């Protein structure tokens, strides 16, 4: 049935969805700049982004199921590190739209070049990184951000090339260790095939966003970094069936 409907889904994207998606990027970016950056209205840099991400999921008819968010979401006012596996481009919309908590992204510097969106993200405090970003500079910016907001990171550092969970890098857990912030593992299932690398055509797939038990720091230092990283990866891997 999905193969039969796919040509109609592609036609829907070409004639309608992508045009509306582009318009949403422009309108959301302008709204964030006006209310979040210039007038500094409370949550003016956050709520428009949440609405944009949810509308994008709805626009492309992508159903998102959220599991255990209320059970494992830290109390209000507690800043944490949200760490999720990275299956595909749609992870960004799913996470920002459905985490239901204000946070800042650590994102690739290439996103800064996206018209309107890059300017809005930079103006509202999201952290851009590339391979030449000094580790000390990244840590300083992340620690400063964690004073006022939570952080969202993909510990794999890039999208999965085969749909499987990749190796985690230590950066996010070094930040959690240095700030003594709790890590909230999040597993994303179903987004790998939605927008494959090098393809503009969205492929329909339901997505499940699962929250796991928060992992608190056990002391401070390299052992704590390894502990946070191992526990986070194990929680996500168990849900993905990759133990």
Predicted stretch roles:
Residues 1-2, 66-69, 75, 234, ...:
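Soluble, non-transmembrane catalytic domains of enzymes that act on hydrophobic metabolites at membranes
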Residues 54, 93, 173-174:
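Active-site phosphate/pyrophosphate- and oxyanion-stabilizing loops and adjacent acidic/basic residues
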Residues 4-7, 136-243:
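Non-catalytic C-terminal accessory region of glycerolipid acyltransferases
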Residues 62, 126, 180-181:
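Short glycine/serine/threonine/alanine-rich loop segments
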Residues 61-67, 133, 192-193:
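Short gly/ser/thr-rich secondary-structure transition/capping motifs
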